[in-house]
Amino acid sequence: MTRAEFFRLMAGGLSSAMLAGPLSAATGGYDFWFTRLRYDSGDWDVDQRTPSNIITSLIDYTTLRVDPKEHVIALSDPRMLTAPFCYIAGHKLVEFSPAERQNFERYVRSGGFVMVDDCNHDIDGLFARSFEAQMAKIFGPKAMIELPDSHGIYRSFFKFDGPPNTALELNGWGDDLVHEYLKGIEVNGRLGVLYSNKDYGCEWDYDWRNKRFLAEDNTKFAVNIVMYALSV
């Protein structure tokens, strides 16, 4: 059973009252809906055009039935447990409440997939240090690993030799480093947390009308991430 199939079953098991609101898409015949997680600390609502650009690319390149709307739901809300894919980003402190921590762990251990993007592009920045500390508390200090360039996420739809660089890191934003790898946390052989210090959120945050000026569509890697999340 794929991750997407599992979470459709979970959604089907919830009461109609619980499904009312942002995740009602779970019963609307969609294969994918973009869920941004709101957390009480920090700045969760960054890169506001990124979700719509990812959604557009999924519609353009794949045959998935994609909900055209972004859904924002609190990490502390149990309805997030039915989402096939969740997104967290920010620049500032990540300090989960007990309810947020419980849902994050339950979601990932149950087979969920969370993409986490450090908008600072800084491995020593506040977001990076505090988020990694949260992951160590939940999954243990050695749970976060470097993903090799041979990882399936780089071949799930388009072909990549490794994580694509962003214009921001090439131009010296943040820690002035080009980060050669992504990190992740695996549970029972499945990648449950994908963690990036490359600031993909800012890279994909642009007016859709400017996409025609790109030599290469930089949201293709976002398509890979989603397709990987749904297929394993």
Predicted regions and their residues:
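N-terminal export signals
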Residues: 5-26
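Glycine-rich, histidine-containing beta strand-loop boundary motifs that form or position
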Residues: 10, 117-118, 148
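Aromatic-Pro/Gly-enriched surface loop or interdomain linker
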Residues: 21-85, 89-92, 200-232
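Short alpha-beta junction capping motif
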Residues: 34, 85-128
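An acidic, glycine-rich "communication" segment
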Residues: 42, 50, 121-207, 214-219, ...
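Alpha-helical scaffolding within the catalytic cores
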Residues: 70-75, 97-103, 177-181
